[in-house]
């Protein structure tokens, strides 16, 4: 397995170009199964999960190629099963189910894998599709969905806010007969992006970005060209990198209005932040950040995917900060690893109490999930001595060329090929 060897401490400064959002690119790739004409998707990040998704679409019979943009022609899809060998590494594959059953009347997906952070059940996807008229069976580790004729529009009230299930229901409802209303829908920018992609293909959707999405079913979706929005979590990660190293950074190809909660907390931490239409700059003026209190919750509140990075920020900040995680259980696996580097933290239920220290020391640490592993790499950049981060395949699932981008900011980081 590959590792990162990071030599610190370094002050990170310079410019970084933000990639397309993984969490928008994946649902958009699967939503392309709904299209009866070719689609071109621009600004798709080069990531393991994206490669897996493209491979899965090919196995279903779609023509998929990448030359800068990703081109998908789903006219000849003739396989309706997403097999275990592709699905086991990636939760996003559940998003194949809604489009398959909506367009072809049948679909089956192996129960998914991905990061092991707490319970991420597929129940909400299943109950949403059932309310649209699909028959669902769980057999031999597969979720199997079928419908005679078309799905039927429905008034669906989500039990809890779920990005994944909102995507599934919204995609399936585009080809349903009649109107579907999703109440308590997720409001994330990536939901808005997926809806806007579907609208480009001819879907009739309104209310995306609010907790009530209305979809009027159409008979077919055509093709089109669409550009994926910038990755707000990658943007936030690089902003934190500059903040903890007392540096300065400009993030290009960013979308500031998707990061309001994160930018507010960085300002609280003492960062000088400016934004333009597609850029964000952060300057610490050489100062150490101040500890901040953070509580994660669904958008537009503070994103759970930035929790590990802010835990690290608090652990090297002036003062004591509290980080409360309300979205996922079991999402503090980075804390014991950071403690190996000299961080002072206590976990009480779903809160980490962070006592800031002046400096961290390099150590051998292990990545446990995607965002936790990013925080360990950033910790290595500012720690004294050498840090080796193991199991970095987690990072490759969500960050495009993170070592190249960090190196351009002054980090001393090398990928060491595993046995």
Swiss-Prot record:
InterPro entries xrefs: Enolpyruvate_Tfrase_dom (IPR001986), Enolpyruvate_Tfrase_sf (IPR036968), MurA_subfamily (IPR050068), RNA3'P_cycl/enolpyr_Trfase_a/b (IPR013792), UDP_GlcNAc_COvinyl_MurA (IPR005750)
Pfam families tied to this protein:
EPSP_synthase
Main localization of the protein described in the UniProt heading: cytoplasm
Q: Which domain of life is it from?
A: Bacteria
Q: Which GO terms describe its molecular function?
A: UDP-N-acetylglucosamine 1-carboxyvinyltransferase activity
Q: Which GO terms describe its biological process?
A: cell division; cell wall organization; peptidoglycan biosynthetic process; regulation of cell shape; UDP-N-acetylgalactosamine biosynthetic process
- What is the enzyme's main class? transferase
Q: What is its EC number?
A: 2.5.1.7
Q: Name one GO cellular component term.
A: cytoplasm
Active site (record annotation): 115
| Keyword Repeat among UniProt keywords | no
Q: Which residues carry this modification: 2-(S-cysteinyl)pyruvic acid O-phosphothioketal?
A: 115
- Quickly give the catalysed reaction: phosphoenolpyruvate + UDP-N-acetyl-alpha-D-glucosamine = UDP-N-acetyl-3-O-(1-carboxyvinyl)-alpha-D-glucosamine + phosphate
Looking up HAMAP family in the UniProt record yields: MurA (MF_00111)
Return the similarity comment: Belongs to the EPSP synthase family. MurA subfamily.
What job does the chain carry out? Cell wall formation. Adds enolpyruvyl to UDP-N-acetylglucosamine.
- Give the protein's recorded name: UDP-N-acetylglucosamine 1-carboxyvinyltransferase
Organism of derivation: Shigella boydii serotype 18 (strain CDC 3083-94 / BS512)
């Amino acid at each position: 397995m590959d590792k990162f060897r990071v030599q610190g401490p370094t002050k990170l400064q310079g410019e970084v170009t933000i990639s397309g959002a993984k969490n928008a690119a994946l649902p958009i790739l699967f939503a392309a199964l709904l299209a009866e004409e070719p689609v071109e998707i621009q600004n798709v990040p080069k990531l393991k999960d994206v490669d897996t998704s493209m491979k899965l679409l090919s196995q279903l019979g779609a023509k998929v190629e990448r030359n800068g943009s990703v081109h998908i022609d789903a006219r000849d899809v003739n396989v309706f099963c997403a097999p275990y060998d592709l699905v086991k590494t990636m939760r996003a594959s559940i998003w194949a189910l809604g489009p398959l059953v909506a367009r072809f009347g049948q679909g089956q997906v192996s129960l998914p894998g991905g990061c092991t952070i707490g319970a991420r059940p597929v129940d909400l996807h299943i109950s949403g599709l059932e309310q649209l008229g699909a028959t669902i069976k769980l057999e031999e580790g597969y979720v199997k969905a079928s419908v005679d004729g078309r799905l039927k529009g429905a008034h669906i009230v989500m039990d809890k806010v779920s990005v994944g299930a909102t995507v599934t229901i919204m995609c399936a409802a585009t080809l349903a007969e009649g109107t579907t209303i999703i109440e308590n829908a997720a409001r994330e920018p990536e939901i808005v992006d997926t809806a806007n992609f579907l609208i480009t293909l001819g879907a009739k959707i309104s209310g995306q970005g609010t907790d009530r999405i209305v979809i009027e079913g159409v008979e077919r979706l055509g093709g089109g060209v669409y550009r994926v929005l910038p990755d707000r979590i990658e943007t936030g990660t690089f902003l934190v990198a500059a903040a903890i190293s007392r540096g300065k950074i400009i993030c290009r190809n960013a979308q500031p209005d998707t990061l309001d909660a994160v930018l507010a907390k960085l300002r609280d931490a003492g960062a000088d932040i400016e934004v333009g239409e597609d850029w964000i700059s952060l300057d610490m003026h050489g100062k150490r950040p101040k500890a901040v209190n953070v509580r994660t919750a669904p958008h537009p509140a503070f994103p759970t995917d930035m929790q590990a990075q802010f835990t690290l920020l608090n652990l090297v900040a002036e003062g004591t900060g509290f980080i409360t995680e309300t979205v996922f259980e079991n999402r503090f696996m980075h804390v014991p690893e950071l403690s190996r580097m000299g961080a002072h933290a206590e976990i009480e239920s779903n809160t980490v109490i962070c006592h800031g220290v002046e400096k961290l020391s390099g150590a051998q640490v292990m990545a446990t999930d995607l965002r936790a592993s990013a925080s360990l790499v950033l910790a290595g950049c500012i720690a004294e001595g050498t840090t080796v981060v193991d199991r970095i395949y987690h990072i490759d699932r969500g960050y495009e060329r993170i070592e190249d981008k960090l190196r351009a900011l002054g980090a001393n980081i090398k990928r060491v090929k595993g046995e």
